[in-house]
């Protein structure tokens, strides 16, 4: 765009500069906004840029001054760098397959060091403590610092990634493996950022509801620029902006590289991220250039240096740091004679030392200081660094991420660059270096952390205990529904409605729904509990005149997440780990379409287990034939199998309201009173039927996973044992009647709320017996239940056959027939679907007769008679294939 009147242009610029000098940024911002509004009303389309020039956001004149001892901190930071590198290399000398990462921490050491020295607040009596999501691949640096602090021994460093024998260090942040050290698992790319957002949001929730004091704690999330391509990394940033989460700080290590090559070789990742975050209403703080560039910026009166910085793409910037100062002079400054003139007095070595912002402690401190003091917005810090910084041959190379070994020449260069006191003769031994106790370095480390409340990272393992109301509180569920038909989903809603009335536990219950509350019949809670909103309710809801109107409230208890399963699960994790992060045990209930649970957010569910989260996941509208009208994408037949892959997840598929009540009460007791590091997955259905009263003595069997529901004590020549769960148990009950009435065969009916728990018990017993060959073998719970029973065993569920197949090895009878809903779902009536998937009462009878025929107890023709009697088509297509 050509400047047609330079004099007028300068007058406008001088006027703006005068306003900035005399009246400040706010006034200048106001005037520019008004001018933009005027132009817009006049129909003028003004140029609009959501990004700023490729330079630091904070000008030199506005930088907060770092108060500490720069030279001492560089000394300590260098030792941390060395020990991190030595730890990874020594582990790979022991076993080359152990792996490890050097380059990520090498690029981010300064980013962490400034945080540890000045910003990461540890929990104290006066301060709840900051929550820090460390970038997973940078864990060696965190261990190395903890070693200097005396928290981790040299033996532990030696055992990096060697955990089986004990006293080792986990590869990445894993609370399950190091429960007093790591707070959050982060190395599955993208899960750290989305969890950090919802931890910050849940912190505001706890503040609004009076559980924790307001405004003290921060959530820090460290991540890489390549990680930002994960949908979870950026998918929830609009929520953070909308909720004005000024307790949240993202620090993105922009070393411009991912595993295979550049993040945006043909563009600029920092500029791209600036636009994305600024558009989501974040405070964006770019830290691109270090302080050695400041004199050159001061000379850049015509803007040519800035223009050159703006036009160079990331692939070229990576090249500059993979080469040397002469290359930078030729290819960066050599683009214009004026730029070459600007650096004519600088040697190639001095040009090489022109540093990037993420390696400059002064620039990083200024950015962090601005972030913690910024109000009304979350902050993202985009810090430009060099991958593999200081590692010599691996620095800024495409192979940097996979570097686990450094040659002797590079080690020597690393030692010299960072002034490590290791002799040439000892270099290949890679000795750890730790200053003596009482040294200046040790004192400085201790003083910096003491000023911030103690060492980090640290994780609280136990919290205050909260009593859980007795089972009798849920008496209405235990006594049955009389003649009224209700679903287990409705029973669940009634259980929660009762529990929230308890003075101790009630306020700590956190109902979480992804825009499906009305589907599950929970809209009555809108008015009762309120929906959490950081601003309350600024409008009059359209249904205000109704009893169950949509009520938003700053102190609302329900988290209504919208159509957002990953966000809802992240909220659940935040609530489920609140006992550790805030010493406030909360009990979250996240209810969702069971098909859109583990199948959709399985990685987050795995992270929940690693995080030792407590709470209930409720798979609503479960069962492949029970949610009959929704079809293939909605009908769940495998969520229990997916849940079974998480070791500390307890899963149940109850049929009746009393089973559900017993399970929820016992789970609450285990997680809230005993603080066991487990969580529960329970499926509930939308099929209405009469809910019976609980049989006497059923509680123990419900929790263990199996109990005798109906015993056929009548005389019969032949007998079978029928197992079922969920709504299909009712088909099993009907099958028992058909066997008796149509064939004179007796049948005991067993309710099996959890085949997964039966498998867990069986495996534990099997292992014990293997390890104690000289002692009397123990029996699994399945064997205890079925050991003295007559006849073959038949199981039918609304899930894949593999679900009930899990217990086959402990079933005493050789004849164990399993029915299940393998195959794609489809829409139709429940009756037709259950026949299609071969799990209804007639198919249960058929399987029972087949098992008896296999034993020789009855003739095969009886099976054929049943096929004809019930109109079963022998040539029917296999549901697995159609």
Question: Where on the chain are the PLM-derived regions?
Answer:
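Non-catalytic terminal/interface segments that mediate subunit docking, oligomerization
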Residues: 58, 62-84, 105, 120-123, ...
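A structural-propensity feature for long, helix-poor, extended segments
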Residues: 221-222, 228, 603-624, 629
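Glycine- and acidic
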Residues: 15-18, 65-73, 91-100, 124-130, ...
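Beta-strand segments within the central parallel beta-sheet cores of soluble alpha/beta enzyme folds
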Residues: 125-135, 156-162, 212-222, 249-252, ...
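Thiamine diphosphate
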Residues: 6, 162-185, 191, 205-216, ...
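N-terminal amphipathic, basic-rich helices that act as targeting or association modules
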Residues: 1-149, 414, 486-502, 506, ...
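Cofactor-binding active-site loop characterized by glycine-rich and histidine/acidic residues
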Residues: 62-63, 68-80, 84-96, 101-243, ...
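Generic, well-ordered alpha-helical scaffold segments in large soluble proteins
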Residues: 15, 19, 34-38, 79-86, ...
